[in-house]
């Protein structure tokens, strides 16, 4: 059996990074182009587009693509796509730049000032941000939901069109062993003889329930390999830095998994906290990375109490035949059971809640930050030792993230103007 095809009608990876002389020539040309400044999420989307993880997208969405994605989960050609990938600009910046439809522009990361891509603007359009929030995030609560807050903080206009990606960022230097493009993970899987790979999405150090989910998948008989795939894009307050988390993953993989059945990789996307919709996005690009299954457990990609614990599982049931080649591996509540003397789930354990230790990522981080002594059922000692060392020197931050924490003063002003 072969690996699943990349997503989209052409069934081939479509990386957008230029290389060699073409790249150098485009960088030189970009110096004379009008500049459009990007948020950290837009910059991370450039990296995902560049490596081919967002295949079959050729750039930032035009209005028809945005509308189909938001309201129907489809691009105009019928390809399933669950979340917007858009570039916005304020009315003031648009007027000052003189940019028009047909213009070529240089895309600059607002924080670093670095050039990341060039873009041909095929369309300048406005969107209904309230409709996007309600359709994609199922809420318009900009004060509590970080994805909604960022939606309302976007500029008044979107720019749609193809890009030429020029800057691969610095993740290669930070994670030289694990920062892999879809073509590279596919080659890795093939070298191991894997064709039925399951992906595990994580932005936290892995506690015992996480470990159990991956092992449960490996023991299911449906898969021949697993990839722990960690997000290392921009973090929010209370999150543990990627470098520390990677040390935790290494300790877990080295001590508790057979290396012939496990792979570890990282990717640069910024979390959207889209719950069910984001679970579908995770599935799309995991298919591009070569995976046939995605573990979808409790509250996948959620935040707060905006989604039911298993909404991210049931949304896959709403898809039409052929929407994805990847399938969800749906797993119920997992916990440590003292009577079973092992990790278990509602499918395997008959005992009551008084016998169970249910571990959540928030509980795990808060206990570590406060220096609380954790029972062995929470995490492996090698992982806990790394985290204890990190928290001894880390600045104390509030674990619960406010939706506005990543936003600039200009973005906050837009929200306070009335969610325009």
Curated annotation (Swiss-Prot):
Annotated pathway, please? Sulfur metabolism; hydrogen sulfide biosynthesis; sulfite from sulfate: step 1/3
EC numbers for this chain: 2.7.7.4
Matches recorded under SUPFAM superfamilies = Nucleotidylyl transferase, PUA domain-like
User: Sorted alphabetically, which keywords does the UniProt record give?
Assistant: ATP-binding, Nucleotide-binding, Nucleotidyltransferase, Transferase
Look at the named UniProt entry and state the broad enzyme category this protein falls under. Answer: transferase
**Residue spans crossing the bilayer:** none
Kindly state which reaction or reactions the protein catalyses.
Answer: sulfate + ATP + H(+) = adenosine 5'-phosphosulfate + diphosphate
Task: Give GO terms: molecular function aspect only.
Answer: ATP binding; sulfate adenylyltransferase (ATP) activity
Q: What InterPro entries does this protein map onto?
A: ATP-Sase_PUA-like_dom, PUA-like_sf, Rossmann-like_a/b/a_fold, SO4_adenylyltransferase_pro, Sulfurylase_cat_dom, Sulphate_adenylyltransferase
- Supply one GO BP term: sulfate assimilation
Q: Which family does it belong to?
A: Belongs to the sulfate adenylyltransferase family.
Name it: Sulfate adenylyltransferase
Gene that this polypeptide is encoded by = sat
């Amino acid at each position: 059996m072969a690996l699943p095809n990349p997503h989209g009608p052409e069934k081939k990876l479509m990386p957008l990074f230029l290389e060699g002389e073409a790249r150098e020539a485009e960088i030189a040309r970009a110096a004379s182009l009008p500049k459009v400044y990007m948020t950290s999420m837009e910059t991370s989307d450039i990296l995902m587009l560049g490596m081919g993880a967002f295949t079959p997208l050729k750039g930032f969405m035009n209005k028809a693509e945005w509308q189909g994605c938001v309201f129907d989960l489809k691009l105009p050609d019928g390809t399933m796509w669950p979340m917007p990938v858009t570039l916005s600009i304020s009315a003031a910046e648009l007027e000052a730049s003189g940019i028009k439809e047909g213009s070529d522009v240089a895309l600059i990361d607002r924080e670093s000032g670095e050039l990341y891509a060039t873009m041909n603007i095929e369309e300048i359009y406005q969107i209904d941000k309230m409709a996007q929030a309600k359709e994609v995030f199922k809420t318009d609560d900009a004060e509590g939901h970080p994805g909604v807050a960022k939606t309302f903080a976007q500029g008044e206009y979107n720019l749609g069109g193809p890009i030429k990606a020029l800057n691969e960022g610095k993740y290669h230097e930070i994670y030289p062993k694990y920062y892999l493009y879809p073509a590279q993970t596919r080659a890795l899987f093939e070298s191991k003889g894997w064709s039925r790979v399951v992906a595990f999405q994580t932005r936290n150090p892995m506690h015992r329930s996480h470990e159990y989910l991956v092992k449960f998948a490996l023991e299911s008989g449906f898969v021949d390999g697993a990839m722990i795939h960690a997000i290392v894009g921009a973090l929010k307050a209370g999150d543990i830095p990627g470098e520390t988390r990677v040390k935790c993953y290494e300790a877990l993989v080295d001590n508790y998994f057979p290396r012939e059945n496990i792979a570890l990789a990282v990717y640069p996307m910024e979390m959207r906290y889209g719950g069910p919709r984001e679970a579908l996005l995770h599935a799309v690009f995991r298919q591009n990375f070569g995976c046939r299954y995605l573990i979808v457990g409790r509250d996948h990609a959620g935040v707060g109490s905006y989604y039911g614990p298993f909404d991210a599982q049931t949304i896959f049931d709403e898809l039409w035949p052929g929407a994805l080649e990847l399938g969800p591996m749906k797993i119920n509540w997992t916990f440590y059971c003292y009577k079973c003397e092992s990790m278990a789930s509602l499918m395997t354990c008959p005992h009551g809640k008084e016998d169970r230790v249910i571990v959540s990522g928030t509980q795990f981080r808060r206990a570590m930050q406060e220096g609380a002594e954790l029972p062995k059922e929470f995490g492996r000692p090698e992982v806990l030792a790394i985290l204890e060392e990190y928290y001894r020197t880390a600045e104390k931050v509030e674990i619960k993230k406010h939706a506005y924490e990543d936003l600039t003063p200009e973005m906050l002003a837009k929200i306070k103007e009335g969610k325009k």
